[in-house]
Amino acid sequence: MSKTLLQENETMAVARYVRMGPNKVRRVLRQITGKSYSEALLLLEFLPYKSCDPIIKVLRSAVANAKNNLGYDTTKLVIKKAFADQGPVMKRFRPRAQGRAYRILKPTSHITIVVGS
């Protein structure tokens, strides 16, 4: 998503190559879309998912971008869009019995959060 696709009152932050499957990240992003910054941060602090940590980092970065670059008040910011795209998949091999090898897939994802007033 380029800056030209953003509305005038929106800003974004992206974390790329996060070592987590995109479906596991989307499960949390669906819950915070449309919520205010403080409400989403409170929700992310107490959700029991591992994907909350990188999402909190991206959310704080998006809010810092809005505050520093555009001068917005952080109390009025709302999460407009939040999505996770699939990144490259790292392929590893696990040795098994009798000379066999099983393929292990380690997915990555790109997390994007758009905030606006």
UniProtKB/Swiss-Prot annotation:
Transmembrane segments: none annotated. Keywords: Chloroplast, Plastid, Ribonucleoprotein, Ribosomal protein, RNA-binding, rRNA-binding. The keyword Methyltransferase does not apply. It holds the Pfam family Ribosomal_L22. GO terms for molecular function: rRNA binding; structural constituent of ribosome. Gene3D superfamilies: Ribosomal protein L22/L17. It comes from the Eukaryota. It is found in: Plastid, Chloroplast. Signal peptide: none annotated. This protein binds specifically to 23S rRNA. The globular domain of the protein is located near the polypeptide exit tunnel on the outside of the subunit, while an extended beta-hairpin is found that lines the wall of the exit tunnel in the center of the 70S ribosome. Belongs to the universal ribosomal protein uL22 family. HAMAP family: Ribosomal_uL22_B (MF_01331_B). PANTHER family: CHLOROPLAST 50S RIBOSOMAL PROTEIN L22-RELATED (PTHR13501), LARGE RIBOSOMAL SUBUNIT PROTEIN UL22M (PTHR13501:SF8). Part of the 50S ribosomal subunit. This is Large ribosomal subunit protein uL22c. It comes from Emiliania huxleyi. The lineage of its organism: Eukaryota, Haptista, Haptophyta, Prymnesiophyceae, Isochrysidales. The gene is rpl22.
